[in-house]
Amino acid sequence: MDDVRSVLLIAALSNAVKHKSVPAAGAVMGAILGTHPELRSKAGEIKGLLGSVLEEVSSLSAEDREEKLKTIAPDQYASLFEKKEKKKIGLPDLPKAEGGVVMRFAPNPSGPLHLGHARAAFLNDEYIRRYGGKYILRIEDTDPKRVDPDAYDMVREDIAWMGLSIAETIFQSDRFSKYYEVGKELIQKGHAYVCRCDNEKFKDLKMHKTACPCRSQSPEEALDLFDQMLDGAFTEGEVGVRLKTDLSHPDPAMRDYPLFRVLTSTPHQRVDAIVYPLMNLSVAVDDHLLGMTHVIRGKDHIANTKRQEFIFRYMGWETPVYRHYGRMGIEGVVLSTSQMRAGIQSGEYSGWDDVRLGTLRAMARRGIQPQAVRNAVVEIGIGETDIQFSWENLYAKNKEIIDSQADRFFFVPDPVLVPVSGSDPVVAKAMRYPGDESRGYREIPFAGSLYLPKAELESGAAYIRLKDLFNIKVLYEGDIIRGEYAGDDLQEARSKKAPIIQWLPENHANPCTLKTPDGDVSGVCEPEAVTTQDRIVQFERVGFARIDAAGNPAVAYFTHR
């Protein structure tokens, strides 16, 4: 447990130095389990060590705490004293970016892209636009267990929807020979070896900072074994290639991590291979060979960055400039690809664009504009602080884009047909867009009976203003509801604080289903609203909607209010 104790010691010293006091047990424990999720299963053992560590740190003077932290974890010490930059509008400048950048968006084709992917995609795209250069789409498909064949096309479609400035598309599955070349070079230089230890044995040695017997191989022996791997001499799980790192590194995950594995149980549809590169090897190789100048990704990749830097140093390559942004919590939608797929297969979700999902195609089907998503994630920026994604902010930005384009129409949810007496037939004229007569008027004919929202009637409203028409009294006679004309005066309705509601005549009502995250809403709408598919409209008193299926009956997807 020495390595765990060293991690505890760093966390306790950091807490004490940051707050200029003795370390707080709860904060130290939370920091450990938050930054080292692999230790959560050992929480009980950690608590047993925590007391002695806290006692040791508490016994030190403030100066000694700083000195000790500076010695054993200089990066952690430095991060505590970094000056916080004043918040700027827009994204911060990137170092070494003048003259152009080469950047990449690198999704795994396990399913369609979602809002989390959009953050990385748009942030990189913004910097390409700012500095000029080359934006590469790199499909990271080296793990056949995580590849959905249909996702290749879905990713392309999502990229097109976002409007990214992609200059070149690369498939990692086309580049295995390049990974093998670098793997052999690392072995020849004595930086990698072929490990035949079973996983449990190696894990035990690693946790004790002890080299496995395979580590002492000569480059010639290791190369011969690697060639045997490529020739199919080993079975899955029997052997792998590991990078020689630092066995005394405080983070066990950094110690001699794997570069290649044998995989035969899951064939890859694009490559006939037995030996597969692991992510840190393929990413490092491609970031170098493709000339990446800057890499922007989530801080959950900080450990991967450190792993990849070993490869860059061993190969004598110049490392890109790395920036890591904080986690973005997204509530209210499903983002897990496996959970989405299971829901689709069970019939819980209608498809990858079901409105309850957080995929970009679900956003598009609802009428969310790609520019609105771009604006929202750029505003969030690339800071390392974890944030909560604001749907209201996204909706506000989307409204800025679609509001002026969206004609207004009536949609009556859960319609109840109500006869209205006392008025001659009349044609109501309602503006297509408030305050803009140049857009014209809708004509809605009234001739005796009309549809009203069930919710308004269930509230027991006795006096109602029919928007753009007239006032009515509502009479409830057992199960029968009827209306009586009560004049045209809008001011009278306002003085009575009467609800002003949407309505539709029986002969001018197009059946329409409004799909929302809370379920389908049956209703009727103006026929003019649903003449064109993919149109964005605003249903008055309901919200914006995208027309998904035009005609009679119609289907609309709720966007937001």
Curated annotation (Swiss-Prot):
Molecular function terms in GO for this entry? Answer: ATP binding; glutamate-tRNA ligase activity
Tell whether Protein biosynthesis is among the UniProt keywords: yes
Per the annotation, which location comes first and is thus the protein's main one?
cytoplasm
Keyword tags: Aminoacyl-tRNA synthetase, ATP-binding, Cytoplasm, Ligase, Nucleotide-binding, Protein biosynthesis
**GO CC annotations?**
cytosol; protein-containing complex
**Subcellular location field:** Cytoplasm
Which residues span the membrane?
A: none
Could you tell me the superkingdom of the organism this chain comes from?
Archaea
| Gene Ontology biological process terms from the UniProt entry | amide biosynthetic process; glutamyl-tRNA aminoacylation
User: Motif location ('HIGH' region)?
Assistant: 107-117
* Keyword Lyase recorded: no
Q: Which reaction does it catalyse?
A: tRNA(Glu) + L-glutamate + ATP = L-glutamyl-tRNA(Glu) + AMP + diphosphate
EC number(s) in its UniProt entry? 6.1.1.17
Reported function = Catalyzes the attachment of glutamate to tRNA(Glu) in a two-step reaction: glutamate is first activated by ATP to form Glu-AMP and then transferred to the acceptor end of tRNA(Glu).
User: Which PANTHER family does this entry report, sorted A to Z?
Assistant: GLUTAMATE--TRNA LIGASE (PTHR43097:SF5), GLUTAMINE-TRNA LIGASE (PTHR43097)
- NCBIfam families per record: gltX_arch, PRK04156.1
Question: What family does this chain come from, according to its entry?
Answer: Belongs to the class-I aminoacyl-tRNA synthetase family. Glutamate--tRNA ligase type 2 subfamily.
Protein name in UniProt: Glutamate--tRNA ligase
